[in-house]
Amino acid sequence: EQFGHTTDILVRRAFGNVYDILFQGTPEQIERWLLPCVLGERVFSVAFTEPEAGSDAAAIRTLARKKSNGWQINGKKHFISDGAFSDFFVITAVTDPEKKHRGISTFIIDKNSSGVTVGRDQPMMGLRGTSHVELFFDDVQVGPEHLLGEEGRGLKHALETLGRIRLAQVCARAVGKATRVQKLSIDYASQ
């Protein structure tokens, strides 16, 4: 709630993206990817939204094909909050098209991986101090250690993460903003 007294960017940094890796990551993934973020050394974004999928998270088209040495990822995402200055991304991709929503998995993709392109910034009304970009994945190769959580459980993990983010960012921030407005109103009325 106290973060609601400040700018939205602080709330996003404090609560935004840790849940996927914290709850689904292996000890090695937590050490490699999450710990540097907690220490303030790295930043990452979740990249679930796609142009063709809209609000239907199960309709994503980014595809991860299993290879002998890991995965090959192709696709695009958009409206990725903080994507311009993130060091890596947690993304969802279809790993088994036949299984529909049970065929979506979650991956950790380093921004500097060959084939990762950060596209144009997509301005959002009322959200200052952040960016919302397009991401493109063209034959991005990742090892098996980049699969986050269980194969085929990515949509479930993503929706759980979004629920936690909404609780932390939206609800707590709204209460914080309301108490801040109340205090400012009382201070003004007392003058």
Question: What are these language model-derived features?
Answer:
Residues 26, 75, 107, 137, ...:
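Residue-level signal for inorganic ion chemistry
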Residues 74-118:
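A short core secondary-structure module
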Residues 116-191:
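Glycine-rich beta->alpha junctions and the first turn(s) of the following alpha-helix
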